[in-house]
Amino acid sequence: MRTRFHAAVGSLLVATILISPLALADMTVNVGGRIQVDAAFFDDDVTNLNSGTEFRRARLFAEGDIDENWGYKLQLEFATGDELIADGFISYRLTGGKLLLGQSKVPFSLEEVTSSKYITFMERSAAVNTFVPARRVGAIWYKTAGKMHYGAGIFGQNSNLDVDGDEGLGIGGRVAYAPILHDDNVLHFGVNASLQEPTDTDAETVRFRARPTAHVTGTRLIDTGVITNVNDTTYLGLEGAYVNGPFSAQAEWIGTRVDRAASAGGDLAFDGYYAFVSWFLTGESRPYKGATFGRVTPKNKRGAWEIAARYQAIDLTDGNITGGEQETITLGVNFYVNKYLRFMFNYSSVEVTGGVNGDEEPSAFMLRAAIDFK
C-alpha cells in the first residue's frame, strides 16, 4: 500500500503546482534518453552465474522550466520490462542551489551521483551498489558555492517499491570541497552521512548483498540474508578524486552500522571501498562540475580512448551474520566515438571468501554499447 509519507509528498507536489504562478508561454520542454546494452560472459567456479545479455538501461525523460524559478523532470526506466520512475520531481531554484521535491538521487557518494552515462566502469563498485540509498522520494537540497558543494535531504523509500506498513524515514547529507579546481586539474574530497529507519513491519529488517560485478547475472555470491529487529542503520562515506589532464584517480570508503536489538545478536558493522585510476590515451580529461563528473568530449573525429583499472572490496560478515567477503580487480577500456556514443569493455577477476556457496574465484568479460541523446 502507499504510505503516508508518499501521500504527503504527493500532496505537496500537487499543491506546489497549483500555487505556482504558471505561465504556459514560459514553459520549456527538453526530451532525451539513454540506451545501454550489455553482454557478459562468465568463467564460473562453484556457482553458475549464467552468461547472457540485457538492456542495462533504457530511459526516456522530459525536463524543463516552468518559469524562472520552477522546473521539473520525469524520467522513466523501461529496461526491466515494466515502466518504472527513475526520477520524478519538481525543482525550485534557490540562490546558488536547488530544492527537489519528488524522487531523485540522495546526496551520497561521488560514484553514485555521477550519472551512469559518465562513470568510468560499466558498473559502480559493490560498496556503492550495496550501501548507498540511491533514488528515494523526498525533499533534496543541494548548493555549489565556489569550491564547496553541499547536499542534504529527508526521504522515504523508492516510489517503485510496494511497502506494507509505515515507511521508514531517512536523512542524509554530503559535503565536498575541491581545493584545486581548474578545467583539467581537480582535487576533490567529500564526506557523506545518512541515517535510515527500516520499514515499520513486524520484523523491521534490512538486507545487504552484492553481485560479482556484472549486472547481467542476478546471482549474488555474498549476502547477509534478512537481518531482523533493526532499529536503524547508519551510513558513513569518505570520497576523494584527482584529475590532472588525461590522468584520473578516484576512491571511496563506505561503512555501515546496523543498530539491532541485543536479543537478536547486537549491533553489526559492514564496510567496503574501491580505488581506481584511468588514463586517456588521446589526451582528454574528465570534466568536473558541482562535485561530480560529467560528459567526455573527444578532441577529434577519431574518438577518444580511455584505459582504467580498479580494485574493490566489500565485507558483509560481522557478529552472527556471515555474508561473506568479496574482492574484485577490474580492467577497462572505453572508446568514445563521440560525446554521445561509447563502447565499453571490462574484465573482472573476483575472489569470494565465506560467501553463499563458500569460497570461489569466478571471472567475467563484459561489453556495453551506450548511447544517450537530448
Give the location of each predicted region.
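Bacterial N-terminal signal peptides that target proteins for export
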Residues: M1-S11
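Extreme N-terminus of proteins, especially the signal/transit-peptide cleavage junction
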Residues: A23-T28, D359-E361
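Outer membrane beta-barrel
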Residues: D26-T199, F270-K299, E306-G319, G324
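Outer-membrane beta-barrel pore domains
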Residues: D45-N48, Y92, Q103, A193, ...
